[in-house]
């Protein structure tokens, strides 16, 4: 972890409309360890684990920068349900990661919960 107390770890997304969710492993980007990325590490339906989820291992959060380990910006987030990429910002509040995707000045977000 580059900054103590940063967003590194495993995060659970909010539930989708059908009750599923993803776990995203956040840490230094492979291409540039000074930036933060997040890969989809697990997927769950409303009935349990989904090991055949087609997007396992794909980057969801890419190239986020932080000077303080709590506020992240300058990167993107990929929405696998819509297959769209948005400018992104994140704010760490204890074990909650407020993740936002933005189009122009309009942002929409989720509160992800730290799993570990």
What are these regions (language model features)?
Residues 1-6:
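Sec/Tat signal peptide C-region and signal peptidase I cleavage site
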Residues 7-87:
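Central antiparallel beta-sheet cores of small beta-barrel/beta-sandwich binding domains
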Residues 115-116:
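Short, solvent-exposed mixed-charge patches
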Residues 79-90, 95-109:
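Short, exposed beta-strand-loop hairpins at the edges of beta-sheets
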């Amino acid at each position: 972890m580059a900054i103590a107390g940063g967003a590194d770890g495993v995060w659970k997304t909010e539930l989708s409309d059908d009750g599923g969710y993803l776990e995203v492993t956040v840490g230094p980007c492979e291409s540039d360890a000074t930036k933060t990325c997040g890969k989809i590490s697990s997927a769950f339906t409303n009935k349990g684990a989904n090991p055949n989820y087609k997007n396992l291992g794909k980057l969801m959060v890419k190239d986020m920068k932080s000077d303080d380990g709590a506020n992240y910006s300058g990167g993107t987030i990929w929405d696998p349900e819509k297959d769209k990429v948005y400018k992104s910002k994140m704010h760490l509040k204890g074990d909650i990661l407020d993740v936002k995707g933005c189009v122009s000045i309009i942002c929409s977000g989720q509160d992800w919960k730290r799993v570990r």
